[in-house]
């Protein structure tokens, strides 16, 4: 009655609906309908339209309400909302702040020549100049035992075992924005995100809103934080100002609220920093491209995962498949997971890496025909036997690994020894994990070569999961785009491009050895993925 719909088609349809819905929501965020009514009382006019003389003042205070004790750190006498600037100032730290306390910045935009405390038309915002984080563990040379020279207070802090307690860190950047466009708001359609930043006063029959001042919290990155100790009497603060469009302001408010919500759910400052980097390190055009690229990356990831699981679930024989390559993928994913765990990476990255490691362990179990028998709490592992065709594949696989080991082992050992001598680490475990993961990133693609060698010897590629390969190939090319857009380690960026080379060789072999999936090969196996229906006699 209804046409048959595959699960993949359903997922693609849901994905397209999600992308369209997201585009509609984003349009609603960045677009604000201006007031088009003729009556003045129906609109809210901008204070900046009269071009008043303004002044920007920045104070520090121990409490956010600034009931006394505030100190002026910067004043911009002739402030122009359309002129951006960057000023470096030195801020004196009170004694309470140096003793693991907090410090606030109070930013005032007010009439020139008038104290902000006496200006009825001033706008101000309060933001923290400090945040709490765990101190970075010290790194030492594992050969000599020497570390970087520390100040006496830092040595005392380490000796008192305070590395497990959050300490106050200094935010060295303060980024300010003011909406420069003279936008006319409709009183009956005022966006809720802008409303909390808006101060309005009555002038006759007209409603006038004061300048929209905004403190960009997304620009506060972990890399800019400085640990505060009792000897830190002064610390630098870079005050940056630039005008901002209304659409970008609304978008930034939503993103800032999203990051704050994640922190309320238990995300640490470092976890939130991973998300901030997506928005701060790229402009809005790249950000839009990143969204679409990431959405398709997620789709192809899911489809590759689905087809890969389906392929291995029904896999009965390892004919034409490199078991060494399967074992290597399992090892490399576990090493990368342990490396991310050691580096205290965000849960957004850590959890998928952990799930991927479990799946690779399951593949190894299928590839080596391992059966686990539990006798009480003691497991017994039984390995299945290989038939003649699988033994032939295993011979080619072993031969390829033999040639590969002549190149791979000296490179990995040499890199590990070099790192041990010239690089500092937190512990021996950290050195082992870093050496292994560097080997995975730098030379991991070499372990894809045994499968190419097996394909060459068998003159066949029919045994490979080509649907999963194609989806992974799309993701590989998407990763190439990300390699230019997103900040990442150089080794990971090179890893994106090296996979392209190997996959192009796979494509060449597929063209060289065409596949008739309906034909039964010399091992009595057909690679037709569509099961044939039962025949019925009339």
Curated annotation (Swiss-Prot):
GO MF terms, alphabetically ordered: phospholipid scramblase activity
Glycosylation sites per record: 90, 100, 229
One BP annotation, GO: apoptotic process
Pfam family, one: CLPTM1
Compartments, record wording: Endoplasmic reticulum membrane
GO-annotated cellular components: endomembrane system; endoplasmic reticulum membrane; membrane
Transmembrane residue ranges: 10-30, 285-305, 325-341, 403-423, 429-449
InterPro entries: CLPTM1
Cytoplasmic side: 1-9, 306-324, 424-428
Function comment: Scramblase that mediates the translocation of glucosaminylphosphatidylinositol (alpha-D-GlcN-(1-6)-(1,2-diacyl-sn-glycero-3-phospho)-1D-myo-inositol, GlcN-PI) across the endoplasmic reticulum (ER) membrane, from the cytosolic leaflet to the luminal leaflet of the ER membrane, where it participates in the biosynthesis of glycosylphosphatidylinositol (GPI). GPI is a lipid glycoconjugate involved in post-translational modification of proteins.
Entry similarity comment: Belongs to the CLPTM1 family.
Name of the protein in question: Lipid scramblase CLPTM1L
Protein source organism: Danio rerio (Zebrafish)
Lineage: Eukaryota, Metazoa, Chordata, Craniata, Vertebrata
């Amino acid at each position: 009655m209804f046409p048959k719909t595959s699960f993949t088609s359903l997922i693609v349809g849901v994905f397209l609906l999600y992308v369209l819905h997201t585009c509609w929501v984003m349009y609603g965020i960045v677009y604000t309908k201006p007031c088009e009514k003729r009556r003045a009382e129906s609109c809210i006019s901008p204070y900046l339209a009269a071009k008043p003389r303004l002044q920007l003042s920045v104070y520090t205070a121990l409490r956010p309400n600034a009931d006394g004790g505030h100190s002026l750190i910067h004043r911009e006498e002739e402030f122009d909302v359309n002129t951006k600037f960057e000023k470096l100032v030195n801020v004196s730290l009170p004694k309470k702040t140096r003793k693991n306390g907090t410090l606030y910045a109070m930013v005032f935009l007010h009439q020139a020549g008038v104290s902000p405390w006496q200006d009825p038309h001033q706008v101000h915002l309060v933001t923290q100049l400090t945040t709490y984080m765990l101190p970075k563990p010290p790194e030492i040379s594992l050969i000599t035992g020497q570390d970087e020279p520390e100040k006496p207070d830092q040595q005392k802090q380490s000796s008192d075992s305070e590395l497990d307690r959050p300490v106050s860190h200094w935010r060295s950047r303060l980024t300010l924005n003011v909406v420069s466009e003279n936008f006319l708001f409709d009183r009956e359609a005022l966006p809720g995100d802008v409303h909390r930043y808006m101060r309005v006063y009555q002038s006759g029959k007209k409603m006038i809103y004061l300048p929209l001042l905004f403190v960009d919290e997304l620009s506060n990155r972990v890399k800019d934080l400085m640990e505060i100790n009792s000897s830190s009497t002064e610390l630098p603060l870079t005050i940056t100002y630039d005008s901002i469009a209304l659409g970008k302001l609304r978008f930034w408010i939503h993103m800032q609220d999203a990051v704050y919500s994640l922190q309320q759910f238990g995300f640490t400052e470092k976890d939130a920093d991973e998300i901030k980097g997506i928005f701060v390190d790229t402009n809005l055009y790249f950000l839009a491209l990143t969204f679409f690229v990431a959405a398709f990356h997620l789709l192809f990831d899911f489809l590759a995962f689905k087809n890969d699981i389906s392929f291995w679930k029904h896999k009965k024989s390892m004919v034409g498949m490199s078991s060494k390559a399967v074992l290597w993928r399992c090892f490399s994913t576990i090493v990368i997971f342990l490396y991310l765990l050691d580096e205290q990476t965000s849960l957004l990255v850590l959890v998928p890496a952990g799930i991927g490691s479990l799946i690779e362990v399951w593949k190894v179990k299928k590839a080596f025909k391992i059966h686990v028998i539990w006798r009480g709490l003691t497991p017994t592992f039984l390995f299945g036997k290989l038939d003649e065709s699988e033994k032939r594949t295993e011979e080619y696989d072993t031969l390829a690994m033999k040639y590969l080991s002549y190149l791979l082992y000296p490179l990995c050992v040499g890199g590990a020894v070099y790192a041990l001598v010239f690089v500092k680490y937190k512990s021996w475990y950290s050195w082992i994990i870093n050496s292994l993961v560097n080997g995975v990133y730098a030379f991991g693609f070499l372990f894809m070569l045994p499968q190419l060698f097996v394909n060459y010897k068998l003159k066949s590629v029919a045994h490979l999961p080509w649907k999963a390969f194609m989806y992974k190939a799309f993701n590989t090319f998407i990763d190439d785009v990300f390699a230019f857009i997103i900040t990442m380690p150089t080794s990971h960026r090179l890893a994106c491009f090296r996979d392209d080379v190997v996959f192009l060789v796979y494509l060449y072999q597929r063209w060289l050895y065409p596949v008739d999936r309906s034909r039964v090969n010399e091992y009595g196996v057909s690679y037709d993925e569509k099961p044939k229906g039962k025949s019925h006699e009339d």
